[in-house]
Amino acid sequence: MANIVFIATSLDGYIADKQGKLDWLQSVPNPDNIDTGFVPLMERIDGLVMGRNTLDVVLSFGCDWPYSKPVFVFSNTMTEVPQGYEDKVFLVKGELKDVLADLNTKGFNELYIDGGVTIKNFLKEDLIDEMVITRFPILLGGGAPLFGDLEQPLNFKVMKSEVVLGTLVQTTYVRER
């Protein structure tokens, strides 16, 4: 069982700019659509866990639904799944550990944890096992940080670090417990 973060950050650790935009993710050309690890991640996982804000961002992209696995969305305000996504998106509520235990019981053991607030909440509860962080060579100077305050330090071990697309540094970390 593993809870996995797969995310891009700026050099200064932001996942969105000051306006909450992700345009900077297009700053590195990828004309041949070379995969940077997303395809193997999607093959590995059983499902995704994200918050409502991240779901809204994904829906705003105006493209085909990017996930082939079930998406579990934490939301205190959402009462129903957007029309057309009832077989793809499932609402969850409750304590993280309880929701995870329920998902694991249902066979969802390898989970992709996505979205700033959701990742921070999982880290606060020490529920992240692996992180793949891709750093873009740009300083945003502010915005939504990937990491927030923690009760205690969490140690991770570098498993792999490589340059992708000739300019992005992608590092895989595994939690040391």
Give residue spans per PLM region.
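Enzymes that bind and transform nitrogen-containing heteroaromatic metabolites
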Residues: 1-177
